[in-house]
């Protein structure tokens, strides 16, 4: 079928991690400028496995997943604003309307193609040496030994700091006091908003990190490819170009506001400045916080930014568990919504914690400012005794290591 797909503009141009990670190339310059200038919401249809906004391309907000034949059909139609079951997808050379049903193969046709072209031997042959890798992979020099030989100059793999303060004792459970709101987010914030896996912008904190090390923009690669380097990943946390921090008005992207300076900066830079001042930070969010793929770096990056707690209306199950696993406190509003709280960047947040912490216990969160002092009833979303042990150990990684050292 390749020659017919080529005629339609569907060329086989390579293989690898491309469209679903945002690596399939830029839009035509004029089209991209038109989208930005007019703030258009444009759509893509893809047969990949990710449809987060801005993921396929930073200019494309709406992405729809479909089978490969439907991707071709929508491309022929040129719009997602049609009903494929009743609207024509194009006009043939004789001026007749063409419908999806006219070009859609029936089961018999599909079965005949499969029987002629697919066999068990194909899979046996391809998978028999799959773990050997191509010649290029086999030529890579590797070292052996019990301990990994960290290369301090590598921009792909760096020694992570999760065990730097490892202790055999549980951390002291004490109140979170005078915490600054780092972000105020809405509903259905995905793990891709929290820790994007796509392209790295040159003017982002991660981009600056590479530029300081003389890495060319063409060699930035993606956040997904750089997940072995915590310095890149922490700079990419909350750096999605489509995230909306409601502490700032009419601003899209990974920005926050530094208090009391009232200075707009990247989320990373604000978090690092608060860390220098030894000030705690928290995140506020609406419903379904952390929905989407179960991305470990969404919790790891949150931890490395110094975020002590995420206060939300509700949590996605796996991300909530991952936050606990990194020693970050998930706190769920009991009867309020985020909008009820009218959170401001100048507020100070206090969460009352004691040594006798229990799973799913009620917590009191106090929001303070010059104008108000309100108490909010919340629920601790550490759901089990095991999770409580992880939190007390400052995360599951430290918990596991502590038990290994004990034994």
Task: Specify the residue positions occupied by each region the protein language model found.
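Mobile "lid/hinge" segments at catalytic clefts and subdomain interfaces of large enzymes
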Residues: 8-126, 324-325, 329, 359-360
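Non-catalytic terminal/interface segments that mediate subunit docking, oligomerization
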Residues: 1, 138-311
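Short hydrophobic alpha-helical runs that function as membrane-insertion/retention elements
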Residues: 12-14, 308-313, 330-333
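Short helix/loop capping segments that flank catalytic or ligand/cofactor-binding pockets
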Residues: 21-23, 53-56, 74-75, 83-85, ...
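Conserved phosphate/anionic-ligand binding catalytic regions in large, soluble enzymes, centered on
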Residues: 15-20, 49-83, 182-200, 288-301, ...
